[in-house]
């Protein structure tokens, strides 16, 4: 079947505007390590795909999945050691204050939980994000998808978008530390606005490498000041590590660590399972216990062995 036939078939069953990459879409049939192969056998170096963290079809991952599939597939409302073993290993890679975990299937679910934790802890509803970002597909998280709104602002009164920090095309006629202080001050102003409107401030969520925003070069000063403003206002800092985490920046295990700050909540997505539907939330014990005690949260497939 040629590409045109595939595209027509796709439109009939998936809808006319189902997203595809490239002017001439690529028909990928196989992956191995860093390589992808199309239907004609052509090999592509995969420098884009953000999901298979340790490479396509890694033999250790494939073997682990096959072994578990032939042993047990059940939800987490039974006792099982695997979820505990993994969660303990995961939390050990973070700062000591991030000591508890909830496992999910996707980054969207993880960010949903993070928002609920932040709002429950603070009593406010207001969430701050950047003005060109993406954090997932559910109704609540889509309100943060400012990269898909023409003016970079969410239609929800509970979300305020601040200019993402960028020295290449700065939002202010400033340079150096003064520029980064000006960007950080936008967070402070958004917090004050939430309080003045009676909405209350709950937290801020950033991808620490600002991947959706274009990977700008951001100094530690900016994030340190932002987190200071967030904590001074009683809010929480959510680090969306779906794309930045698990050592991808090369220097640190987690993207936010580059800035010398500690997150209150960290959200993880499918790279955690090398592309398979495994995600999670790692958080301070007080935040996670508050969430557990206030809501009957469970996830049939989140962390299932």
Question: Residue ranges of each PLM-predicted region?
Answer:
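Conserved N-terminal phosphate-binding loop of PLP-dependent enzymes in the Aspartate aminotransferase
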Residues: 1-305
